[in-house]
Amino acid sequence: MNFNLVEMYNGLLRFNKHILNELAEGLKHLPNLDGVSKGDSLIINEQGNPAWGSAAFIPTFENAAYGIEWTKDDNDIIRIGNAKFHRELPIQNRLKGCVYNEKKISYFLNPTGWAKPLENGFVPPLDGSDGDVGVRVPEFYMCVKDTGTKYQLWISDFNIDGTFTRVYPFIISHTKTMTRTREDGKEEVFSACIKHDDTRYLGGNKSSSVVATKLQGRPRTGISYDKANEFCANRGDWITMIDYLEYCALQALCYIEYANFDNQAALNTNLTSDGFKQGGLGAGVTNLNWERWTAFNGNNPIVQTYWTAEHNIGNGSTNGDHYELGNYNTDGSNLNTYPAVYRGILNFFGDIWTFIRDVAIINRNTNYNLSLIHISEPTRPY
């Protein structure tokens, strides 16, 4: 990802238009200049709003952070920190769908539907021909506090007390990754929105015993951790599996947004009386009958990668739009469910097993009663 304000292009220096767009977006939220005096600075007032004043801004947990708190004996969660941020979700709202080539964002997608035209009228191809499709996650800070009887999970744009972990900006595939075969026969990863009738891209475990239409346009599965690393390396050294810190960062954003550890809680698109999100992302595809799923396509991925684009989810989350799969049930009727989407990321949980870089869970006995978790230093070259 290129986050430099000035970059080289065809041997010439130019301003990075994407960084300028981000700056312009931020300037829209500045207060007007009425009553501003010489020497005034931009501060956050007691209500959590940007304002001009003479006092230096000192970020605190109350004015510059938001999070959740729960007791150690149960998961009874309350919101803590700046209530305005809980309503406006400034960090979560900076997750944006984009098309990117290697480490550079080519353009951001329409936030209300990625298949929709951009502001300049351009209709983006989402099949990988113009670049990979992903979600750009912004830089922010997060930390976990132990108060003795309670835990706290915080996020902020500031390392308030020096204990926050910096989450560098990164791009995550908009769904579990697909693969394609190059001319030299090697398989490489790519991220795109592929329709179910696109015969070029066979997903799942590519089994010849499964009808091709039940695998087309789906993520790649049925491979080992080493194979996944190999497919990433075949694409280039700029792409890796998601690492443990990034995975935790995404989970933290969702936990705090809904003030709920149960991502699968029932969908509720209404806000609370305080203007907060509630509920969860819904069950997604976790409620599939295992035997029926096995009979349908051998427990390969169910939802095509084009689904969010087709339903204009954009940068949003689960909205109740249903996914219908013809002739799925034993009586010939259709499967009807709705996939779990978080901020444009399709199947945020529960569809297939996920590899996470830098963490290994080792089962110590055959009954899986005791497991050890080993976390190594992040290896992603930020």
Roles of regions detected by a PLM:
Residues I373-Y382:
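Single conserved hydrophobic/aromatic residue that forms the stacking wall/gate
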Residues P50-W52, I78-I80, E187-S191:
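Short linear proline/tyrosine/threonine-rich motifs used for host-factor recruitment
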Residues P124, G128-G131, I155-F348:
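Short aromatic-cysteine micro-motif
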Residues E46-G48, F140-M142, T177, E246, ...:
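Acidic glycine-/aspartate-rich tracts in secreted/extracellular proteins
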Residues M1-K17:
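Short, intrinsically disordered N-terminal pre-domain segments
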